[in-house]
Amino acid sequence: MAFVLSLLMALVLVSYGPGGSLGCYLSRKLMLDARENLKLLDRMNRLSPHSCLQDRKDFGLPQEMVEGDQLQKDQAFPVLYEMLQQSFNLFYTEHSSAAWDTTLLEQLCTGLQQQLDHLDTCRGQVMGEEDSELGNMDPIVTVKKYFQGIYDYLQEKGYSDCAWEIVRVEMMRALTVSTTLQKRLTKMGGDLNSP
């Protein structure tokens, strides 16, 4: 019995070690969280998007995200992480909490945080020493500019209900694209430790 227990402990330690993959596998749970976040965003709808047509804006969702074939595996993970982090930051603001149903907003922020926590498990192992260089990586800079455009738009519109509705619809689009990127990463091997 002691031998079996020792063997199991060794397997767990190896799985979570630098060469293991248990901690960095893009799990089904991550995909389920992503789908749930999209459902929550859909439920947050307070206005008819048609009533806000005059406030529409093309935020220029980065083509690197839309056409993810352009991203290599080593770029896809940081772009996905940045997209989720920026989404969380957008909805975890004072202005956001004034615009949305508090319960739904808290559930959305919790769901985004769960996705980030899962990816954080992998982040150090996947990016390691390169982390400091990622801030300068073109796709990451593009994602940051995209979100800065959303922040600028909200400020320009005075954080109006219609502006938030337009942003909600845009974020559904962005999170749908990030879900597609997650699927693509999974098809690339799912184990983010593999070369």
Swiss-Prot record:
GO biological process: defense response to virus; female pregnancy
Superkingdom as given in the UniProt entry: Eukaryota
Location relative to the cell: Secreted
GO cellular component: extracellular space
GO molecular function, one term: hormone activity
One Pfam family here: Interferon
Tissue spec. comment: Constitutively and exclusively expressed in the mononuclear cells of the extraembryonic trophectoderm.
Annotated keywords: Antiviral defense, Cytokine, Disulfide bond, Hormone, Pregnancy, Secreted, Signal
Range of residues in the leader sequence: 1-23
SUPFAM superfamilies per UniProt: 4-helical cytokines (SSF47266)
SS bond partners: C24-C122, C52-C162
Described function: Paracrine hormone primarily responsible for maternal recognition of pregnancy. Interacts with endometrial receptors, probably type I interferon receptors, and blocks estrogen receptor expression, preventing the estrogen-induced increase in oxytocin receptor expression in the endometrium. This results in the suppression of the pulsatile endometrial release of the luteolytic hormone prostaglandin F2-alpha, hindering the regression of the corpus luteum (luteolysis) and therefore a return to ovarian cyclicity.
Additional remarks: IFN-tau genes are intronless. They evolved from IFN-omega genes in the ruminantia suborder and have continued to duplicate independently in different lineages of the ruminantia. They code for proteins very similar in sequence but with different biological potency and pattern of expression.
Family stated for the protein in its record: Belongs to the alpha/beta interferon family. IFN-alphaII subfamily.
Identification of the protein by name: Interferon tau-1
